[in-house]
């Protein structure tokens, strides 16, 4: 894992392995190309976001590997796996709106800085909520910092209240 960044081919292969073809147009080149383009755009956005942050560089791709492995082990449906992979890539896109100085801190955040950091969840959802995803990506993104015991954020969900994909990411 370390500094390993998925190549475009590796990322596309992982996402294609989770893709469930549309019943009416199974194998349609247009659908496959559309999903492939979406993945490439997401990969560019994630790469731009992580470009200037040594602490975050490659973290989304490492998280994709781990979340994908857990989803595979849980034998989730292909659509659920795709949702988890997409949410994993997009979950921290709202960090673009958080002060860069905050990311320079090493160790535990003060409570004020922790409150500032929490804003990335609503920022991520805010940036993405106008997109009519064909998958349940936003609930996973919104709840990826919830904790099974209810001590997480933003809503303090616990146990089965937390979407499965968000539980995997948390």
Give a label for each model feature:
Residues 1-170:
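Histidine- and acidic-residue-rich, metal-dependent catalytic cores
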């Amino acid at each position: 894992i370390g500094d390993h960044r998925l190549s475009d081919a590796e990322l596309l292969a992982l996402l294609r392995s989770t893709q469930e073809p549309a019943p009416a147009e199974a194998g349609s080149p247009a659908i496959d190309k559309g999903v492939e383009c979406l993945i490439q755009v997401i990969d560019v956005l994630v790469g731009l976001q992580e470009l200037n942050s040594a602490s975050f560089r490659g973290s989304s791709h490492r998280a994709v590997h781990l979340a994908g492995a857990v989803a595979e082990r849980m034998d989730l449906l292909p659509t659920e796996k795709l949702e988890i992979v997409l949410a994993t890539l997009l979950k921290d896109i709202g960090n673009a709106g958080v002060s860069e100085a905050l990311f320079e801190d090493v160790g535990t955040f003060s409570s004020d800085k922790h409150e500032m950091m929490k804003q990335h969840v609503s920022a991520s959802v805010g940036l993405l909520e106008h997109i009519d995803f064909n998958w349940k990506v936003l609930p996973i993104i919104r709840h990826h910092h919830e904790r099974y015991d209810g001590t997480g954020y933003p809503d303090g969900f616990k146990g089965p209240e937390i979407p499965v994909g968000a539980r995997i990411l948390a």
